[in-house]
């Protein structure tokens, strides 16, 4: 996890594509479920929308 990307996300400075990449990295590492609740909810929403996939699943 890159803390600078987290900060950029929280400040609204990431593009939509970069946000999806960030959340996929958080999902793959399991960190999405360890951070504050917003991250897990957002990760689940992105998975449900088909923009991200569950850890271990092919793209």
Question: How should these model regions be labeled?
Answer:
Residues 1-59:
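Catalytic phosphate/metal-binding cores of nucleic-acid and nucleotide-processing enzymes, i.e., regions
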